[in-house]
Amino acid sequence: MIGLTKVCWTMSKKEVVDNSIKIEYLRSSFDNVQSLIQFADQKIGNLLLIDTITVGIFITYATNYELSLKDLTVWNILLFITGLIFTVSSVILVYKSIIKVVCSAQSELGLFYKS
């Protein structure tokens, strides 16, 4: 009977250690996910800044009356295309960042639940 009690106590002690390791791993996983979200947020902010600068350049040239009408039209078309390229590429990069964060979060938390 004493041997059985000792085996049960050893097993429960091992479970406590395993649970502590899992809790610590979960805590570090959430920290990693939080840092990934901050990284994505920073990238989104940078892309919005680039878009704002592009729109500012577009408005500046579009309202510049010193250019001839022909040049103004060419500049408008070029700046519109440039702004469109920046906008589309930034939207793609934002979605890639969000997908990266979601996939990383799923893999971090998935590793915890599998173990």
UniProtKB/Swiss-Prot annotation:
Keywords per UniProt: Antiviral defense, Cell inner membrane, Cell membrane, Membrane, Nucleotide-binding, Transmembrane, Transmembrane helix
Subcellular locations according to the entry: Cell inner membrane
Keyword set includes Cell membrane: yes
One of the protein's GO biological processes: defense response to virus
TM annotation in the entry: 44-64, 74-94
Record membrane topology: Multi-pass membrane protein
Domain of life: Bacteria
Recorded GO MF terms: nucleotide binding
GO CC terms: plasma membrane
Role summary: Pycsar (pyrimidine cyclase system for antiphage resistance) provides immunity against bacteriophage. The pyrimidine cyclase (PycC) synthesizes cyclic nucleotides in response to infection; these serve as specific second messenger signals. The signals activate the adjacent effector, leading to bacterial cell death and abortive phage infection. A clade C Pycsar system. The effector gene of a two-gene Pycsar system. Expression of this and adjacent uridylate cyclase TpPycC (AC A0A1T4LJ54) probably confers resistance to bacteriophage. The genes are probably only expressed in response to bacteriophage infection. Probably only responds to cUMP (produced by its cognate NTP cyclase), acts by impairing membrane integrity.
Protein name according to UniProt: Pycsar effector protein TpPycTM
Organism ancestry: Bacteria, Pseudomonadati, Spirochaetota, Spirochaetia, Spirochaetales
